[in-house]
Amino acid sequence: MLFSSLFLLPLVALGTSVNALSTITQPLANYKWPTQFVRSGEANIQVLVQGAGPTVVILPSYGRDGGDDYNYFTDSLVDAGYLVLRPQPRGTFESTGPMTNVTLEELAADVAAVIDTLGGAQAIVIGHAFGTFLAKVSSVLYPEKIPAIVVAAPGGIELPTNIAGMPFITGNTSLPISDRLVALQTAFFAPDHDAHIWLDGWYPDVLAMEHAAVEAYGRLSSHWGGADTAQVLEVIPADDPFQPKSQWNVTTNLYPNRATLKVIADASHALFPEQGKAVVEAILPWLNLQSSKI
């Protein structure tokens, strides 16, 4: 089963180019994070903007926002001298835009508009889980804007069938908490980690939108490493059931000249709230090397 089948499963009980005139509005007052908005076609994307330096864009996981899960990571990159942009998916926080019949190309255009408007037209893109899918597609469509990508907890190119549908349980807020918690512990958190912290933060409408976009896009295997010119860092949680150990070396074997692998111990698919410091230590040296080239 190919990786894309994770996103092609039925979504039970859940409901192409950058706009040449992408514009920015003024920051909101008294918001939790420094915030600006970027126009992308019919969408108005809220972006959390922190730091200064080479630009890094963070794309969150399936059906979730790019807020609290990435605060420690963002603060660490800001302290290291980076401008960190966290565009919020349509339907999360105050990002707005069409939510039906949305394509991955349109979501990638949102990313590109943010890079053009706030990031000096070039950025390293870090995707987490579903965000790795969008990072890869964005780099294929906009290789001149995205010279390097980090794919954190990307899942394998083949998935265990009993795991592939778990996001549609954890993200279905109409289900009993006990059912969702079992799915979270099984698929997203390593043993002895508290899965309760991810009971909140899900957006069923966003999950449905992203699912439909990936379903329409189809298989990703033809550009598993993003654009042919992109440098790739793959960060694999050692306990991630979405990427069994037999799948750990697929990316580096396919792209030995441009892919690097790091494994994070005692972490599963959620990764960032589980092992924040280890994630920073795995990514930052590679990020420093890549950012020195742009």
Outline where the language-model segments fall:
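Catalytic active-site module of serine/aspartate enzymes centered on a nucleophile-bearing elbow/loop
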Residues: 258-294
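Conserved alpha/beta-hydrolase catalytic His-Asp/Glu region
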Residues: 160-166, 173-228
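Alpha/beta-hydrolase fold catalytic core
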Residues: 2-56, 79-82, 288-294
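Flexible "cap/lid" loop of the alpha/beta hydrolase fold
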Residues: 133-140, 146-175
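Acidic beta-to-alpha connecting loop that harbors the catalytic carboxylate
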Residues: 62, 238-241, 266-268
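Conserved serine/cysteine hydrolase catalytic core
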Residues: 211-254, 260
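Active-site loop/oxyanion-hole signature of alpha/beta-hydrolase fold enzymes
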Residues: 79, 86-126
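Conserved HGGG/HGGXW glycine-rich cap/lid loop of the alpha/beta-hydrolase fold
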Residues: 43-94
